[in-house]
């Protein structure tokens, strides 16, 4: 699930993904946007 959060590294996506989808969510940075894996 791509969310509207800009990023340059996967670390920047972990917090917003966990906030939205819970503790077990992961995140990647793809094309400058965060993609979450709930």
Curated annotation (Swiss-Prot):
Name of a matching Pfam family: Toxin_2
Tissue expression from the record: Expressed by the venom gland.
Keywords: Disulfide bond, Ion channel impairing toxin, Neurotoxin, Potassium channel impairing toxin, Secreted, Toxin, Voltage-gated potassium channel impairing toxin
Transferase recorded as keyword: no
UniProt keyword ATP-binding present: no
Any Gene Ontology CC annotation: extracellular region
Coiled coil: none
InterPro entries on file: Scorpion_toxin-like_sf, Scorpion_toxinS_K_inh
SS bonds (residue pairs): 7-29, 13-34, 17-36
UniProt site positions, description: Basic residue of the functional dyad: 28
GO molecular function annotation: ion channel inhibitor activity; potassium channel regulator activity; toxin activity
Cell compartments where the protein resides: Secreted
Extra information: This toxin is found in the venom of both male and female C.limpidus.
Family designation: Belongs to the short scorpion toxin superfamily. Potassium channel inhibitor family. Alpha-KTx 02 subfamily.
Protein name: Potassium channel toxin alpha-KTx 2.3
Organism expressing this protein natively: Centruroides limpidus (Mexican scorpion)
């Amino acid at each position: 699930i791509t969310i509207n959060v800009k990023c340059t590294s996967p670390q920047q996506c972990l917090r917003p993904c966990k906030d939205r989808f819970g503790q077990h969510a992961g995140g990647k940075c793809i094309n400058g946007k965060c993609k979450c894996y709930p």
